[in-house]
Regions:
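Conserved beta-strand
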Residues: 5-8, 16-26, 57
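Conserved ABC transporter NBD signature motif
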Residues: 57-65
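Short coil-to-helix segment of the ABC ATPase nucleotide-binding domain corresponding to the Q-loop/switch region
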Residues: 89-98
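Helix-to-loop junction immediately C-terminal to a conserved catalytic motif
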Residues: 49
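The feature captures the beta-strand-to-loop junction immediately N-terminal to the Walker
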Residues: 34-36
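ABC ATPase NBD coupling module
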Residues: 64-78, 101, 106-110
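Conserved coupling/switch loops of ABC nucleotide-binding domains, chiefly the family-specific signature
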Residues: 55-58, 108
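Conserved ABC ATPase "signature" region
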Residues: 100, 107-125
Length: 126
């Protein structure tokens, strides 16, 4: 699988967050985004997963243009360095949240939550 950014940029209210950028990420390789605070690493990641839309350029997933595609339809997610959860929700609800957004069947959600909880040794907390 390949993720490609072609001339991708992002500006908000006239302020440039990401200058035009070309990148290729190939499956089976390790890629690292390094830079100081406010360099645009998170902004770039948000563009790649579809949380934000680029001002210019295209984002290709295995050659298919996904630039305007809804984040729910991309089948990708971003894992943050610091765990982000919803403190008002139970462990079960936190794990189930993305699956509910994708409108998965209740039985599938339950099975997947239990599988993930077991992998993370969180079953007693369900």
């Amino acid at each position: 699988m390949t993720l490609e950014l072609q001339g991708v940029s992002r500006s908000v209210e006239g302020r440039v967050h990401i200058h035009p950028t070309d990148l290729v990420f190939r499956g089976g390789t390790m890629n690292v985004l390094l830079g100081p605070t406010l360099a645009g690493k998170t902004s770039l990641m948000r563009l790649m997963v579809g949380l934000d839309q680029p001002t210019t350029g295209r984002i290709l997933w295995d050659g298919a243009d996904v630039t305007g595609q809804r984040v729910q339809d991309r089948g990708v997610a971003m894992v943050y360095q610091q765990f982000i959860n919803y403190p008002g929700l139970t462990v079960y609800e936190n794990i189930a949240s993305p699956l509910r957004i994708l409108r998965r069947p209740r039985a599938e959600i339950d099975a997947r939550v239990r599988e993930i909880a077991a992998m993370l040794r969180l079953t007693p907390m369900l």
